[in-house]
Amino acid sequence: MTFPRALTVIDDNGMVINIIFWFLLIIILILLSIALLNIIKLCMVCCNLGRTVIIVPAQHAYDAYKNFMRIKAYNPDGALLA
């Protein structure tokens, strides 16, 4: 099957269409890579936010609890016998 000659502007055996499709493919790949990088940045921001909002305050509360519950060791010389 041959392409009608009346619709042929330049007889380049599909080179122009091939170049257009390659440029479209490259543009789509660039857009997908930009979207992937933005998703990775979003994950990093969420991890940092979770660390700042949840983990660090819980760690400070646990450290305060440990300091509050610290009991001095038994010293038999310092004990008072009644």
Curated annotation (Swiss-Prot):
Role description: Plays a central role in virus morphogenesis and assembly. Acts as a viroporin and self-assembles in host membranes forming pentameric protein-lipid pores that allow ion transport. Also plays a role in the induction of apoptosis.
Pfam family, one: CoV_E
All ranges on the Virion surface side of the membrane: 1-19
Membrane topology: Single-pass type III membrane protein
Subunit structure, interactors included: Homopentamer. Interacts with membrane protein M in the budding compartment of the host cell, which is located between endoplasmic reticulum and the Golgi complex. Interacts with Nucleoprotein.
UniProt keyword annotation of Zinc present: no
Family the entry assigns: Belongs to the alphacoronaviruses E protein family.
Protein name (Swiss-Prot/TrEMBL): Envelope small membrane protein
Annotated localization: Host Golgi apparatus membrane
BP terms from Gene Ontology: disruption of cellular anatomical structure in another organism; viral budding from Golgi membrane
Main subcellular localisation: host cell
Transmembrane spans: 20-40
